[in-house]
Amino acid sequence: MEPLEFHSGKVCPLNRANVDTDQIIPKQFLKRIERTGFGQFLFFHWRFNDDGTERSDFVLNDPDYKGSSILVAGDNFGCGSSREHAPWALADYGFKVIIAPDFADIFYNNALKNGILVIKMDEQQVKSWMQKAVDGLTLDVDLKQQTIQASDGTITSFDITPYQREKLINGWDDIALTLLKEEKIAAYESAN
């Protein structure tokens, strides 16, 4: 997992509440176990027509939002069935940060475990950023300071547990954390 201490990116507004994991990555694309290659299927039924052409009315197909790396979404993002493929698809597409008023618990934890910074933010602030995204809003997200500075100069703070913050800043996934204790594990195993 790549360390994430600071990220500056363009905002893509997804003004929808209750976006579930099947909408994020439909079930027909879950047959693979590698973590890469899922970005092309992100929001598949919203992004593409039945004939495979892009739908011009979906935000990810809008040229103004190409290259966005911060997704600002509606309430209860990531609800529905538990599937780790959802954060894989978001990360593979290029999203590093997702901001919403609330997240489904399992999605929230899966996203953090896969290196995506998920930030719970006041609904009024989320709506404000969605509106400003039309004018090319960028956000500077400082995980160390736990602040977000918008391109209009406003600064907002956010909360994250110290444990999750340290994991993201250092790029530690669960395996990396286990390997940090390799000597203690080996000592325990040799003693028992």
Swiss-Prot record:
InterPro entries attached to this UniProt entry: 3-IsopropMal_deHydase_ssu, Aconitase/3IPM_dehydase_swvl, AconitaseA/IPMdHydase_ssu_swvl, IPMI_Swivel, LeuD
GO biological process, any: L-leucine biosynthetic process
Pathway: Amino-acid biosynthesis; L-leucine biosynthesis; L-leucine from 3-methyl-2-oxobutanoate: step 2/4
UniProtKB keywords: Amino-acid biosynthesis, Branched-chain amino acid biosynthesis, Leucine biosynthesis, Lyase
A GO cellular component entry from the record: 3-isopropylmalate dehydratase complex
GO molecular function: 3-isopropylmalate dehydratase activity
EC top class named in words: lyase
Reaction equation(s) it catalyzes: (2R,3S)-3-isopropylmalate = (2S)-2-isopropylmalate
Pfam families: Aconitase_C (PF00694)
E.C. designation(s): 4.2.1.33
SUPFAM superfamilies, sorted: LeuD/IlvD-like
Protein family (similarity comment): Belongs to the LeuD family. LeuD type 1 subfamily.
Subunit and interaction comment: Heterodimer of LeuC and LeuD.
Role according to the record: Catalyzes the isomerization between 2-isopropylmalate and 3-isopropylmalate, via the formation of 2-isopropylmaleate.
Family annotation (NCBIfam families): leuD, PRK01641.1
Protein name: 3-isopropylmalate dehydratase small subunit
Source species: Oceanobacillus iheyensis (strain DSM 14371 / CIP 107618 / JCM 11309 / KCTC 3954 / HTE831)
